[in-house]
Design a protein with these regions (language model features):
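Active-site cofactor/cluster-binding pocket
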Residues: 1-192
Length: 192
C-alpha cells in the first residue's frame, strides 16, 4: 500500500464492538510505521444507535476526520449502516459488510420499514461490495460477540502487505486474556 493517506470508516450500532475494532486497527497500522489518527463518534451507541469511527493513516495525517467522498473502505457491522454512510465512500471504494439486520428504533416503533435490497443499492451506487454473514462465522468461532474480530479478519485480506502475525499480535496486546483464544479464532475465520 502506498504511503498516501488512506481512510477507513468502521460503522455499526452500539454494542457491536466497533470501538475495539478501531483500537485493533490503529495498533496494527502503527506497528507498520504509519501516522494514525482515530476519531470516534458515538451517537446513541448505548441504545443501539449508529456508531462510526474514522481511521486515517499514512506518512503524515493532520486531521482525524473523514469527509464525504474520501473513505477508501467502509467496514460495516450491519448493512443498513453501510447504506447510511455510503456518501462517505470514494468513487470505486470498498465496502465490507455483515449482512446482519439490526432494526433501528424507527423500525421497532413501526414508524418505518427496514429498507429492501440494501446490497443491491450499494452496488448500484458504484461501491465494490464484499457482503457476507459474518455473524454466523463469529458464532462458529464461539460467540456472536466476536463479529467485530471476524470483520477485522476480512479487512486484513485487503492489506496483503501487512503480515497476518501483526493482526494476530494486536489481539494479544489489546484484548483481555480471557477472550484472546476466541478472538484469535475469529480473526482467522474471518479471512477470505
Amino acid at each position: 500500500m502506498s504511503n498516501s493517506v488512506k481512510n477507513i470508516m468502521i460503522v455499526g450500532v452500539g454494542g457491536q464492538g466497533t470501538l475495539l475494532a478501531s483500537k485493533l486497527l490503529g495498533y496494527v497500522l502503527m506497528q507498520q510505521g504509519y501516522d494514525v489518527k482515530v476519531s470516534e463518534v458515538h451517537g446513541m451507541s448505548q441504545r443501539g444507535g449508529s456508531v462510526v469511527t474514522y481511521v486515517r493513516f499514512g506518512d503524515k495525517v493532520y486531521s482525524p476526520v473523514i469527509d464525504k467522498g474520501e473513505a477508501d473502505y467502509i467496514l460495516s457491522f450491519e448493512k443498513l449502516e453501510a447504506l447510511r454512510w455510503l456518501e462517505y465512500l470514494k468513487t470505486g471504494g470498498q465496502i465490507i459488510t455483515n449482512t446482519q439486520e439490526v432494526d433501528p428504533m424507527p423500525v421497532i416503533t413501526g414508524a418505518m420499514r427496514y429498507p429492501d435490497n440494501i446490497i443491491e443499492k450499494l452496488e448500484a451506487a458504484g461501491a465494490k461490495v464484499d457482503a457476507k454473514d459474518f455473524l454466523s462465522i463469529a458464532e462458529e468461532a464461539g460467540s456472536a460477540k466476536a463479529v467485530n474480530i471476524v470483520l477485522m479478519g476480512r479487512l486484513s485480506d485487503y492489506f496483503k502487505d501487512i503480515p497476518y502475525e501483526v493482526w494476530d499480535k494486536a489481539i494479544d496486546e489489546i484484548v483481555p486474556e480471557k477472550y484472546r483464544e476466541l478472538n484469535h479464532k475469529a480473526l482467522k475465520l474471518g479471512r477470505g
